Amino acid sequence: NIALDLFGQANGLLEYASKIDKKKSPDDFAFKRNEGDFYNLKISEQPNGHFGTTMLKLFFSSAYRYLLYEELSNSNDETISALSLKSIKEVKYHLKHSKSWIIRLGDGTKESNNKIQQSLNSLWEFTGEYFEEDSIDLEMKKNGIGLSKSLENKWKDIVIDTLNKAKIEVPKSTYMQTGSKQGLHTEYLGKILTEMQSIPRKY
């Protein structure tokens, strides 16, 4: 159900992008772009691994998307505002679901705690990209279309509170990945796109 919700949210945005572009269809954006033309955050292309890693990825992203859609519901762009309002209820459930599992795994057995801690250690360096701004973000902010303020502090409040309840520790390293908004990715995106785009590109 969560995957279907995310497909629906993505489809709404791709349909709007197609309407603005007037040349490319939603399928063109999804299946006919090359790796360097994708600007997704690197955390989304990391392998899901075990259940704890999957839930942690969902938790980080859901916390961000919930705050993002809440803010974008006030966008001057009526379509973005409407899509955001429609998505908030879904993402609120995703956040609640993933948060409960993070706490359950962290505050469970020694093995489950160790596994979720290892997942956190691996994924934490990808979380800084949520809050990077490029020239497009600044232009949208200026025109009242995009975010009017950073969501970083609110996101950290949600995340740190949950990690404390789960009895797992934020890594001490301050290194953060960057570059996805310039089309730079890890080796995993190419593999995902090869599988996802093979049939549409062939036919």
Regions inferred by a protein language model and the residue ranges of each:
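Amphipathic, non-membrane alpha-helical segments in soluble helical-bundle scaffolds
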Residues: A3, N48-F59, S81, N113, ...
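Conserved alpha-helical segments that form or flank metal/cofactor-binding pockets of metalloenzymes
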Residues: I2-K32, K99-I103
